């Protein structure tokens, strides 16, 4: 029975009452829920508390009419109690709904989000063409993190990408390495998670796919700084890490997930507690590199598994046919294309001084040793073409008391992580590595990049030298070693808009240590074995080079090449140079991101100086 029915009965009782007897007026009830005064209107943010059941009964009893009929009064009180009980039930339902909305980000199920699209409260920049982060109308928590990180003005890719990403558009971005695109895609993703109030029970709302473990770790570090004040969760899954621990974290709920393709696909297929049906944003970073190392099939499978109702951001330093195919299947129709480099005169950054030196194979190591000796107080990265070459030269240089760090795909994941961050935090030192460190990694204040072995093509050259002179005002230098037979590579670099000058190094500045090197390799069993592995891998990598017209293995002087590994004569090795090498090289590259064979470090004798 409603309050209106109660009023009708009261009027009947008044009519039957004795003449001249006045009844107390009853307050009007307009909502048909309880006999209380209608509360004043409040703003959306102000919460209007529901009246307690005792208050409802008390207010109704005070406004009840006097009646001579006791049974009528008891009936009215019973009806009022029934109404109060309904009000209490409605209050509990409302409270439960509010609590569910708060915990589920407006969700109605255990881990389902009812909001399919970005909320209407998504940040909109306060100016038409923002140049500073404080003009983007970001949340206070994100802005506080950005200020703590020391950023005020945006780079070009950030200015062009963040506003449309905040509004929910799909973006295909092309930008040089070191352009600041990590913040360009993380800030909109974190703002989306915050505005939708994602909770761990909602599962994963954002996935960032990275080509290498080191780049994934770096993105994870940036995300950790940006999300320090946010309540959303974040995590990382990469090859070589503890899969069971990753699965447990995914089951607890990771709102922002950074991953390498192989491990991500593994969890999508096999981790039952991994909730990704609420995915709102997919970010593919360094897409060209992901495809180059052979993850095309994995990426296609990942895209098929993930929900289609999402925002997608795809960033690639170069636009290839495979990248276009990946964009076609992952992005919605009509994505926004952003290219911040098409008007630039050079393909590399302005603060980078680039040079090359022509030298024979038997001079290369002596030149490198002399250079590193002279620049021990600088921060230097040296690139090699194979894991075994890195292992040999790292063991050799450390043995002769020239400390270096090594980074390559055959290291266990924990060792890779430790050495990467050790070099990042160092003020000076030398890192020798394969191309596993060539893409996307933001290593602070690198002074020199040395390309001991030639890159696979001009694009790889650009990515290698991109480890130095990072940022809008970064400065750095690069030096590439070329054999006389490899000069044709300079023409390709010129066509790719790479400015290079020749560096001339006087012969008297190159230390003459060849005889000591050969004597050491002859006497030390472990170094001798490592040198053979490095020599064989160098020839295999050279034979599988994509630019065989320039890098022709048959033009190599094997005697001089052997001397660069400490042999007086070329060692007898089991090697096959053929068409299969290119395929083997790709398989080896894939293995860097998958399960690793057990590696043990060879025991060394005490250090010996030349």
UniProtKB/Swiss-Prot annotation:
Compartments annotated for it: namely: Nucleus, Nucleolus
E.C. code: 3.6.4.13
Q: Which domain of life is it from?
A: Eukaryota
Taking every annotated instance into account, which residue ranges of this chain make up the domain Helicase ATP-binding? 162-337
Biased region (Basic and acidic residues) positions are 584-594
**Residue span, Helicase C-terminal domain:** 351-521
Gene Ontology annotations of biological process type: maturation of LSU-rRNA from tricistronic rRNA transcript (SSU-rRNA, 5.8S rRNA, LSU-rRNA)
Query: Which residues take part in binding ATP?
Result: 175-182
Keywords associated with the record: ATP-binding, Helicase, Hydrolase, Nucleotide-binding, Nucleus, Ribosome biogenesis, RNA-binding, rRNA processing
Q: What is its main location?
A: nucleus
Question: Cross-referenced Pfam families, in alphabetical order?
Answer: CTE_SPB4, DEAD, Helicase_C
| Region described as Disordered: spans on this chain | 1-81, 112-131, 584-610
Which regions are flagged for Acidic residues bias?
51-76
Return the motif ranges for DEAD box.
285-288
Entry's Gene Ontology molecular function annotations: ATP binding; ATP hydrolysis activity; RNA binding; RNA helicase activity
Per the entry, what this protein does is:
ATP-dependent RNA helicase involved in 40S ribosomal subunit biogenesis. Required for the processing and cleavage of 35S pre-rRNA at sites A0, A1, and A2, leading to mature 18S rRNA.
Q: Return the domain comment text from this UniProt entry.
A: The Q motif is unique to and characteristic of the DEAD box family of RNA helicases and controls ATP binding and hydrolysis.
Give the protein name, as stated in the record. Answer: ATP-dependent RNA helicase HAS1
Could you read off the lineage of the organism from its UniProt record?
A: Eukaryota, Fungi, Dikarya, Ascomycota, Pezizomycotina
């Amino acid at each position: 029975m409603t309050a209106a029915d109660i009023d009708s009965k009261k009027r009947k009782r008044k009519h039957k009452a004795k003449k001249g007897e006045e009844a107390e007026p009853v307050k009007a009830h307009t909502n048909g829920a309880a006999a209380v005064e209608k509360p004043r209107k409040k703003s959306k943010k102000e919460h209007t508390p529901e009246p307690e059941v005792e208050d409802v009964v008390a207010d109704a009893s005070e406004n009840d009419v006097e009646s001579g009929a006791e049974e009528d009064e008891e009936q009215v009180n019973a009806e009022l109690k029934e109404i109060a009980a309904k009000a209490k039930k409605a209050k509990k339902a409302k409270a439960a709904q509010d609590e569910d909305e708060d915990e589920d980000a407006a969700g109605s199920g255990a881990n389902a989000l009812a909001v399919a699209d970005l909320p209407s409260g998504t940040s909109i920049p306060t100016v038409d063409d923002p140049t500073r982060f404080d003009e983007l109308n970001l949340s206070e928590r994100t802005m506080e993190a950005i200020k703590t990180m020391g950023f005020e003005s945006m780079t070009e890719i950030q200015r062009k990408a963040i506003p449309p990403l905040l509004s929910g558009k799909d973006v295909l971005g092309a930008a040089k390495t070191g352009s600041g695109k990590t913040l360009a895609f993380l800030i909109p993703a974190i703002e989306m998670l915050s505005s939708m109030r994602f909770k761990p029970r909602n599962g994963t709302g954002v996935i960032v796919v990275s080509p290498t473990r080191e780049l994934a770790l770096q993105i994870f570090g940036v995300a950790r700084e940006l999300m320090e004040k946010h309540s959303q969760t974040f995590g990382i899954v990469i090859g070589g890490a503890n899969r069971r621990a990753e699965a447990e974290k995914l089951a607890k709920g990771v709102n922002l997930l950074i991953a390498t393709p192989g491990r991500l696909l593994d969890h999508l297929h096999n981790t039952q507690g991994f909730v990704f049906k609420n995915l709102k944003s997919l970010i593919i970073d360094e897409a060209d590199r992901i495809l180059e190392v052979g993850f095309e099939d994995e990426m296609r499978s990942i895209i098929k598994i993930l929900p289609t109702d999402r925002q997608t951001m795809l960033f690639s330093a170069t636009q290839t046919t495979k990248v276009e195919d990946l964009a076609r299947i992952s992005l919605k129709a009509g994505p926004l294309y952003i290219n911040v480099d098409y008007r630039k005169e050079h393909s590399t950054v302005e603060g980078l001084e680039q040079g090359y030196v022509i030298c024979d194979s038997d001079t290369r190591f002596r030149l490198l040793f002399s250079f590193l000796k002279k620049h021990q107080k600088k921060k230097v990265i040296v690139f090699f073409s194979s894991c075994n070459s890195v292992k040999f030269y790292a063991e050799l240089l450390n043995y002769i008391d020239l400390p270096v760090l090594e980074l390559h795909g055959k290291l266990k994941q924990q060792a890779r992580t430790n050495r990467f961050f050790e070099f990042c935090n160092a003020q000076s030192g030398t890192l020798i590595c394969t191309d596993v460190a060539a893409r996307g990694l933001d290593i602070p204040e690198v002074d020199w990049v040395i390309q001991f072995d030639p890159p696979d093509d001009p694009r790889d050259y650009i990515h290698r030298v991109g480890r130095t002179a990072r940022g809008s005002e970064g400065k750095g230098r690069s030096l590439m070693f070329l054999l006389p037979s490899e000069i044709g590579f300079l023409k390709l670099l010129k066509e790719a808009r790479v400015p290079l000058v020749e560096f001339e190094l006087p012969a008297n500045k190159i230390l003459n240590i060849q005889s000591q090197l050969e004597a050491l390799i002859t006497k030390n069993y472990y170094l001798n074995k490592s040198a053979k592995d490095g020599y064989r891998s160098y020839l295999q990598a050279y034979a599988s080079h994509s630019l065989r017209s320039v890098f022709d293995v048959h033009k190599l002087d094997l005697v001089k090449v052997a001397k660069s590994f400490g042999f007086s004569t070329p060692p007898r090795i089991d090697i096959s140079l053929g068409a299969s090498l290119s395929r083997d090289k790709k398989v080896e590259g894939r293995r860097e991101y998958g399960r690793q064979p057990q590696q043990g470090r060879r025991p060394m004798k005490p250090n010996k100086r030349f």
